[in-house]
Regions:
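Phosphate-binding beta-alpha-beta segment of Rossmann-like dinucleotide-binding domains, i.e.
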Residues: 79-113
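An N-terminal-biased, well-structured beta-alpha scaffold segment characteristic
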Residues: 1-81
Length: 113
């Protein structure tokens, strides 16, 4: 075990990360030198606007199922890998729909009153 919370566990000496968090207006500065980008706001044009500063970018992961709003010509023509969260919501969404169908079929709204 580690002596204190700041000690690195044994065998992980080679793992280091420079984590940067920013809003859309700070992406141009934050993406400079970054190798990966995790994108939450998939409707934002921030990646397109900051593209010239993305000098080492290798991977963009978008936390949505679609990537249509992210894609632009320069990104398509680059070697940057784009991944998404396709399939992550399949099971929870199916479970919700099934529950809603059962609740409707059993007239649950009146049953709870």
């Amino acid at each position: 075990m580690c002596e204190k919370a700041t000690d690195r566990p044994p065998g992980l000496d080679g793992l280091e990360v420079d984590f940067r968090y920013c809003a859309a207006d700070g992406l141009a500065d934050a993406v400079r030198g970054a190798r990966a980008l995790l994108l939450w706001d998939f409707f934002s044009r921030a990646v397109r606007d900051a593209w010239q500063q993305a000098d080492r970018l290798e991977w963009i992961h978008i936390t949505a199922a679609g990537v249509d709003t992210l894609l632009f010509d320069e990104l398509r023509d680059s070697d940057v890998v784009v991944t998404n969260a396709r399939g992550v919501f399949d099971r929870p969404l199916a479970e919700y729909v099934l529950g809603a169908v059962i609740a409707y079929a059993k007239d649950s709204l009146r049953s709870f009153d």
